[in-house]
Amino acid sequence: MKNQWKTSDFDYNLPVELIAQRPLADRSGSRLLYIDRSRRTVSHRQFNGFVEQVKPNDLVVLNDTKVIPARLFGHKQTGGKVECLVERILSKDRFLAHIRASKAPKLGSQIIIADNFKIIIEGRYNDLFECVLHSSASILDLLYQHGRIPLPPYIQREPDKDDQARYQTIFAERAGAVAAPTAGLHFNEETFDALRKKGAAITYVTLHVGAGTFQPVRADSLADHRMHHEWMEVSKAVCDAIAKCRKNNGRVIAVGTTVMRCLETATKNGECRPYAGETDLFIYPGFQFNCVDALLTNFHLPKSTLLMLVCAFGGYELVMEAYQKAVENRYRFFSYGDAMLIS
């Protein structure tokens, strides 16, 4: 194992045409690349192969965050155009946002959205602005009336009605994410029925995915990278389900990198404890896993923290080999793309 990992170690060549621009007609119609760590093998399957790998007493953990229509368009009092991406809702009328304009807004200045919603800039923290909505309505009211789904930057088109349903898991409950927990997008009701018939348990954590998930790693050395913060919650019910799973010799299966980060944040010395708050956990090769036994995930961007996490769990050489095979076999990549299972 290397002592000094470089961001460039996680680069790979991806033809642009393999980046999925739209979802498949069937949520569960994706392909599945399966990595067996013990045998060091990589095999090609369909997504229903995920359920085939689940055993009785396994615990499948998903992220129930809900994507909000977080992208707003408005103008300054001077008339200049403004684009606002809500990063985190702090209260009914207060939120943090990324703001794009010809000139950065000054503290105390106003942004007008659709004439009847007024936003005041009250603070700035690095790239984020603290904003207050001056209205009897809530920030969620504003977003659901005038916001747009914030599709990832590698999807080169405007969002449409199809995205409102498909860039959202069918089990999304808690509003607050600006990006979908994409491993969960493959699940339909038939998937859940099949898991229950296998004798698996199902539970949910929450991590509100922020725009930081798309930010590039700017440091050359991973040791110098500072991870973005995201809000998460692991409840006592989840901890109890994990304890029961362990007692029955089952495996904890994380559906997505967000679930992985939740569970590993909440687990210390092999014990998962309830936790609600911030996480900036950065998982890369050399990390000691304490909770998760198997990971279902999508394919991730070159040099991204998500790919680094997957390499930490699956083994660097094996995962990078699998990515090369995925490219050669023309898998669909990123949010609307195919899946990978590592066990």
UniProtKB/Swiss-Prot annotation:
Which portions of this protein are annotated as coiled-coil regions?
none
EC assignment: the record states 2.4.99.17
EC category: transferase
- Which cellular component terms (GO) are annotated to the entry? cytoplasm
Q: Name one GO biological process term.
A: tRNA wobble guanine modification
Question: Known catalysed reaction(s)?
Answer: 7-aminomethyl-7-carbaguanosine(34) in tRNA + S-adenosyl-L-methionine = epoxyqueuosine(34) in tRNA + adenine + L-methionine + 2 H(+)
The main location is: cytoplasm
Q: Which UniProt keywords apply?
A: Cytoplasm, Queuosine biosynthesis, S-adenosyl-L-methionine, Transferase
Tell me the domain of life.
Bacteria
Question: Where is the protein found, in the record's own terms?
Answer: Cytoplasm
Q: Extract one GO molecular function annotation from the record.
A: S-adenosylmethionine:tRNA ribosyltransferase-isomerase activity
The protein's matches in InterPro entries, at most eight in alphabetical order, are given as: QueA, QueA_dom1, QueA_dom2, QueA_sf
Pathway noted in the entry:
tRNA modification; tRNA-queuosine biosynthesis
- Which Pfam families does the record cross-reference, listed alphabetically? Queuosine_synth (PF02547)
Against HAMAP family, the record matches this protein to: QueA (MF_00113)
Similarity remark: Belongs to the QueA family.
Subunit composition? Monomer.
Q: Which NCBIfam families match?
A: PRK00147.1, queA
- State what this protein does: Transfers and isomerizes the ribose moiety from AdoMet to the 7-aminomethyl group of 7-deazaguanine (preQ1-tRNA) to give epoxyqueuosine (oQ-tRNA).
The protein's name in its UniProt record = S-adenosylmethionine:tRNA ribosyltransferase-isomerase
User: What organism does the UniProt record list as the source?
Assistant: Coxiella burnetii (strain RSA 493 / Nine Mile phase I)
